[in-house]
Amino acid sequence: MLIGVGTDIVQIPRIEKILNIYQELFAKKILALKELKQFTLLNKTNHATFLAKRFSAKEAVSKAFGVGIGRGINFKDITILNDNLGKPTVEISSHYTNKLAPFNIHLSLSDDYPICIAFAIIESNC
């Protein structure tokens, strides 16, 4: 059963401007620990695109839950990783998932400078 659908679009230059002002503080604000480890290993030229994709993915997932960021779920409650083939995977913190029936999240990410887009579908396992 479909729980929700969410999408988000981010202008990568917007993230570049934020990085120029706040540097890595922005990354620390939106990235979960596993993501932050990936971020620190990247070449700085890839930082803005990485953050734009994570930002848009987290917004899309929160919208698919029907709440949005800051209304029951926060940036660090959502972790976006990639499997061995590069497919994005989503982990949700247990303090949020304890309130819900089992579910699956499907996430698609794409970027073509200057735009990044994320599309999320959440379905029930029941």
From Swiss-Prot:
SUPFAM superfamilies: 4'-phosphopantetheinyl transferase (SSF56214). One of its GO terms (molecular function) is holo-[acyl-carrier-protein] synthase activity. Keywords: Cytoplasm, Fatty acid biosynthesis, Fatty acid metabolism, Lipid biosynthesis, Lipid metabolism, Magnesium, Metal-binding, Transferase. It catalyses: apo-[ACP] + CoA = holo-[ACP] + adenosine 3',5'-bisphosphate + H(+). Its cofactor is Mg(2+). One of its GO terms (cellular component) is cytoplasm. Pfam families: ACPS. It is an enzyme of class 2 (transferase). The keyword Transferase applies. The keyword Zinc does not apply. Mg(2+) binds at residues 8, 59. InterPro entries: 4-PPantetheinyl_Trfase_dom, 4-PPantetheinyl_Trfase_dom_sf, ACPS, Ppantetheine-prot_Trfase_dom. GO terms for biological process: fatty acid biosynthetic process. NCBIfam families: acpS (TIGR00516), pantethn_trn (TIGR00556). This is Holo-[acyl-carrier-protein] synthase. The gene is acpS.
